[in-house]
């Protein structure tokens, strides 16, 4: 019997050792699963934070470009009066040679002025046949046999814009 007892104790010892190994393995698996879950959560948080940071960076860059594009708007709007005066001077009829020379100088100044405005994003609103309230300001309505209702009959004052923003609408008369 003592051999059987010895054998039984050996089996119990092996089973106990085997159970301890299994328990240890289960504990390691549980810990590894917990660590993997923690890692996955942290990785997800990192990815979201990184994506949010990139979105903020893009939005700030867009706002910066927009601010730069429209920073000169007020200044450019004030310069339009000077532009109108130069254009009026160029349109004056001249009879003598001195007046023609002065007119030529004013024209050169006007051309240079227009190039500088264009360089800084100020553009003339192109003539539109059809009245567009986003681009035009109707000063009055006129009867016209040559124009359909809603068509621009005459441009009274040129309009300008910076990028897509109108800084001064084109003042027009519109056919009834």
UniProtKB/Swiss-Prot annotation:
Where is it localised? Answer: Cytoplasm
Task: Write down the Pfam families for this protein, in alphabetical order.
Answer: GrpE (PF01025)
Return the GO cellular component terms, semicolon-separated: cytosol
GO aspect biological process, one term: protein folding
- InterPro entries from the xrefs? GrpE (IPR000740), GrpE_coiled_coil (IPR013805), GrpE_head (IPR009012)
Q: Which Gene3D superfamilies match?
A: 3.90.20.20, Head domain of nucleotide exchange factor GrpE
Query: What segment(s) does the record annotate as region Disordered?
Result: 1-28
The molecular function GO annotations come to:
adenyl-nucleotide exchange factor activity; protein homodimerization activity; protein-folding chaperone binding; unfolded protein binding
Principal location: cytoplasm
Q: Which UniProt keywords apply?
A: Chaperone, Cytoplasm, Stress response
HAMAP family hit by this protein = GrpE
Please report which protein family the annotation says this sequence is part of: Belongs to the GrpE family.
Self-association or partners: how does it assemble? Homodimer.
What this chain does, per the entry, is described as: Participates actively in the response to hyperosmotic and heat shock by preventing the aggregation of stress-denatured proteins, in association with DnaK and GrpE. It is the nucleotide exchange factor for DnaK and may function as a thermosensor. Unfolded proteins bind initially to DnaJ; upon interaction with the DnaJ-bound protein, DnaK hydrolyzes its bound ATP, resulting in the formation of a stable complex. GrpE releases ADP from DnaK; ATP binding to DnaK triggers the release of the substrate protein, thus completing the reaction cycle.
Q: What is the name attached to this protein's record?
A: Protein GrpE
């Amino acid at each position: 019997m003592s051999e059987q007892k010895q054998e039984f104790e050996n089996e119990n010892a092996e089973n106990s050792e085997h159970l301890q190994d299994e328990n240890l393995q289960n504990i390691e698996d549980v810990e590894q699963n917990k660590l993997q879950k923690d890692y996955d959560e942290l990785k997800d948080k990192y990815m979201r934070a990184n994506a949010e940071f990139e979105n903020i960076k893009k939005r700030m860059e867009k706002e910066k470009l927009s601010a730069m594009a429209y920073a000169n708007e007020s200044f450019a709007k004030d310069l339009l009066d000077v532009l109108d005066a130069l254009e009026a001077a160029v349109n004056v009829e001249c009879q003598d040679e001195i007046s023609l020379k002065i007119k030529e100088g004013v024209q050169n100044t006007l051309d240079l002025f227009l190039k500088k405005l264009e360089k800084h994003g100020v553009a003339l609103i192109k003539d539109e046949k059809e009245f567009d309230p986003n681009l035009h300001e109707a000063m009055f309505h006129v009867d016209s046999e040559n124009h359909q209702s809603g068509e621009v009959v005459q441009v009274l004052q040129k309009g300008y814009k910076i990028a897509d923003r109108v800084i001064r609408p084109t003042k027009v008369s519109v056919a009834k």
